[in-house]
Amino acid sequence: MSIVTKALNLVPMVVEQTSRGERAYDIYSRLLKERLIFLVGPIDDHMANVIVAQLLFLEADNPEKDISIYINSPGGVVTAGMAIYDTMQYIKPDVSTICVGQAASMGALLLASGAAGKRYALPNSRVMIHQPLGGFQGQATDIDIHAREILTLRSRLNEILAKHTGQSLETIARDTERDNFKSAVDAQAYGLVDQVLERRPEESIQPS
């Protein structure tokens, strides 16, 4: 790995003073203590496992306190995204979602699936919805099997988006036929988020 690549992958560390002396955390672990989860980059099985584990840990830590997920993702593997989605719906705490940068494809679905009234986007973020992508190669029978699976997934994803946005299934099916980009304001009007945040609310949690 080159020095440049290593530098780009460095995770900032923060140091806290405790009664036992100094303790260092990587920034994401420190923010996890504040019940903040970061879903950043392509969604794959590894990311899904990490996010699911964090959600379950925070539920066990305090089942009554909200969890916030900050999303900046181009999307990714449908089944990995569905693992995160199902866990968000399964656990007891409300899960708030915040789009920073972009929430595309599965990222947009996870953004929309936050707790009602607690889905946010920052002003210059972008949201993109579309149908699942195919591209399987192989024998004709296998291609047919995978084509039917994609249609099944598309139907299920459309149902989820309809549930969380309030749009009809027909509208969702039409609007996801091709890549459909939305500004933060347009995403709010469509029902993908509840509010566009320009400044942090005064009652927001502060690091302890």
Swiss-Prot record:
Known role: Cleaves peptides in various proteins in a process that requires ATP hydrolysis. Has a chymotrypsin-like activity. Plays a major role in the degradation of misfolded proteins.
Annotated compartments: Cytoplasm
Keywords: Cytoplasm, Hydrolase, Protease, Serine protease
Active site annotation, chain numbering: 105, 130
Subunit note: Fourteen ClpP subunits assemble into 2 heptameric rings which stack back to back to give a disk-like structure with a central cavity, resembling the structure of eukaryotic proteasomes.
EC number, UniProt record: 3.4.21.92
Entry-linked HAMAP family: ClpP
Family, per entry: Belongs to the peptidase S14 family.
Enzymatic reactions: Hydrolysis of proteins to small peptides in the presence of ATP and magnesium. alpha-casein is the usual test substrate. In the absence of ATP, only oligopeptides shorter than five residues are hydrolyzed (such as succinyl-Leu-Tyr-|-NHMec, and Leu-Tyr-Leu-|-Tyr-Trp, in which cleavage of the -Tyr-|-Leu- and -Tyr-|-Trp bonds also occurs)
Organism: Xanthomonas oryzae pv. oryzae (strain KACC10331 / KXO85)
Protein name: ATP-dependent Clp protease proteolytic subunit
Regions crossing the membrane: none
Keyword ATP-binding: no
Pfam families: CLP_protease
Domain of life: Bacteria
GO biological process terms held by the UniProt record: protein quality control for misfolded or incompletely synthesized proteins
Molecular-function GO terms, alphabetical: ATP-dependent peptidase activity; ATPase binding; serine-type endopeptidase activity
GO CC, one annotated term: cytoplasm
Alphabetical list of InterPro entries matching this protein: ClpP, ClpP/crotonase-like_dom_sf, ClpP/TepA, ClpP_His_AS, ClpP_Ser_AS
